[in-house]
Regions:
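Activation segment signature within eukaryotic-like protein kinase domains
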Residues: 286-287
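Protein kinase glycine-rich loop
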Residues: 184-195
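Conserved N-lobe beta3->alphaC-helix segment of eukaryotic protein kinase catalytic domains
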Residues: 211-236
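A short, aromatic-enriched beta-strand patch in the conserved N-lobe beta-sheet
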Residues: 246-247
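C-terminal regulatory tails of eukaryotic serine/threonine kinases
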Residues: 431-518
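Glycine-rich ATP phosphate-binding loop
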Residues: 194-216
Length: 526
């Protein structure tokens, strides 16, 4: 007897995987239907916008690309742009025997460039030590950036390149609705709705769509929380936090379209893949990315309040991002807050105490809990599958010392957990002083953070939906069976007919999808 539930799941999986492969012909047709607004339509937008160099020319991808294209048309501007790119490459280069020589080669021609001040040009010629040269690179970088913000920016704003960026901005501002996306399989459910995979019709890119039920939000007073999450996601711009692509509403739902993280959450990897816990290299890598995400939120005055492995998602490549910012809150003028929020087992002592205010240190406490859980396969104050009341868990958090019985706890791991799980916020790593940065702890000695932020550090594992297994299973036809099939069906004779009319069609993606179907059928019905 056929399991119809499994069949539905099979069809959803098949369609989802086909969408991930993409249909280039359909995308080409969709692209041909898109038209940029005309320059004459941008007059009102031109008056409305006040261009900001950092936002327009550095943060926004289209503006950055068009500004770079414009600079390439003026040799003196191109020199400054090339210098900044060379500085960026030098900053990301591994320190070694050639690092000082590269630094010298970077600064020697600076005196002939159009952007440095006479004083800086003189100092560049006179500098001899590596320390002097490194300090001068910082100054030269600042002067090159200031140079580009002056006349080059004014010329860019008067050029057709800026008009093109306005056309892109006007296209970006067009209304978004559910008809702009194709909805695929359900990914998960939550208290206010569900998350499903969707595909943008214009680009073919896959996203996760968080659909919040309006009735549930109204009934449970969740409107402000949903709005706050949307506002927080709009502000963040970090490779370590899920990004918001757009937001729209239907008659029944508010929809947030965000990064699709197909590798599962850390909780799944800790408890459901192999033995409980993660390897030391994975623990350090994920903790480093979590620390970068928290520091970005804190730099924007945002308190996360709900860091835990379940809300840390992995992408196809194996990197992780913080997600589910529904409990995040803006801290106004560094004023602490008192409202209790978070998940039991990850909340800091100051959250659990009555009428005690708290601030950023609570996020570092939750990170300590998460590191402990990744190593030990259990939380610091509750054993695996142990049934504990919220009050007992609260008392344990307030009173008990954390023990490190698991064999994978190294001295550095124990130390960072103790510092992050310190009872008093002022003694907690990341909060002891303004310059207290958890990334400087020896636990992270193997991580090059500039490389990590630039996406140059290889993740310990690839966490795609099937990893390396699916290509090995779905590797094509078995020779004898395939040859028997085309002979028995008469296809071989038809293909061998010299008078047969033929046409070429690229169908590699459909073949790969067919293999996936049989792979899924095996697990559903065998």
């Amino acid at each position: 007897m056929v399991d119809m539930g499994a069949l539905d799941n099979l069809i959803a999986n098949m369609t989802y995987l086909q969408a991930r492969d993409g249909d280039s012909r359909e995308l080409r047709r969709q692209h041909q239907s898109l038209v940029l607004p005309g320059p004459q339509d941008c007059a009102e937008l031109h008056r409305e916008l006040t261009p900001d160099f950092h936002s327009l020319c550095q943060q926004q991808p289209i503006g950055r690309r068009l500004f770079r294209d414009f600079l390439a048309t003026v040799p003196s501007y191109q020199v400054a742009a090339d210098f900044l790119e060379e500085v960026c490459s030098w900053e990301l280069a591994d320190p070694g025997s050639g690092h000082g020589l590269a630094l010298q080669a970077l600064l020697v021609p600076v005196s002939s460039h159009p952007f440095p001040s006479p004083a800086l040009a003189t100092r560049c010629q006179a500098a001899t030590t590596e320390e002097e040269l490194a300090a001068l690179v910082v100054l030269a970088k600042a002067e090159a950036t200031a140079f580009l913000q002056d006349q080059p920016l004014r010329d860019f704003l008067a050029s057709p390149f800026y008009d093109k960026s306005l056309q892109g901005k006007l296209l970006e501002r067009q209304p978004v609705c559910d008809k702009d996306f194709t909805e695929f399989r359900l990914l998960g459910r939550g208290g206010f709705g569900e998350v499903c995979a969707v595909q943008g019709k214009n680009t073919g890119k896959m996203y996760a769509c968080k659909k919040l039920d309006k009735k549930r939000l109204k009934k449970r007073g969740g409107e402000k929380m949903a709005l706050l999450e949307k506002e927080v996601l709009e502000r963040v711009s970090s490779p370590f936090i899920v990004s918001l692509a757009c937001a729209f509403q239907t008659r029944s739902h508010f929809c947030l379209v965000m990064s699709l993280m197909a590798g599962g959450d850390l909780k799944f990897h800790i408890y459901c893949v192999g033995e409980r816990g993660l390897s030391p290299s994975r623990v350090v890598f994920y903790a480093a990315q979590m620390a970068c995400g928290l520091l970005h939120l804190h730099s924007l005055g945002i308190l996360y309040r709900d860091l835990k492995p379940k809300d840390v998602l992995l992408d196809d490549g194996g990197s992780c991002r913080l997600s589910d910012l529904g409990l995040a809150v803006h801290i106004q003028d560094d004023k602490p807050i008192t409202q209790r929020a978070g998940t039991s087992g990850y909340m800091a002592p100051e959250i659990l105490m009555e009428k005690v205010s708290y601030s950023y240190p609570v996020d570092w406490f939750a990170m300590g809990c998460s590191i402990y859980e990744m190593v030990a396969g259990r939380t610091p104050f509750r054993d695996y599958k142990e049934q504990v009341s919220k009050e007992d868990l609260r008392q344990r958090t307030l009173k008990e010392e954390v023990s490190f019985q698991h064999g994978d706890f190294t001295n550095d791991t124990k130390d960072i957990c103790r510092l992050l799980l310190a009872e008093k916020p002022e003694q907690r790593l990341g909060s002891r002083e303004k310059s207290d940065n958890p990334r400087k702890h020896p636990f992270f000695k193997s991580i090059n953070f500039p490389h990590l932020e630039a996406g140059l550090v290889e993740p310990p594992i690839c966490a795609g939906p099937f990893g390396e297994v699916l290509p090995k299973i779905c590797d094509g036809a078995v020779p004898i069976a395939w040859q028997e099939e085309i002979i028995e069906t008469g296809l071989f004779e038809e293909l061998s007919d010299p008078n047969r009319c033929t046409f070429f069609s690229s169908s590699s993606s459909s073949c790969s999808s067919a293999s996936v179907v049989w792979f899924l059928l095996f697990f559903c019905f065998v």
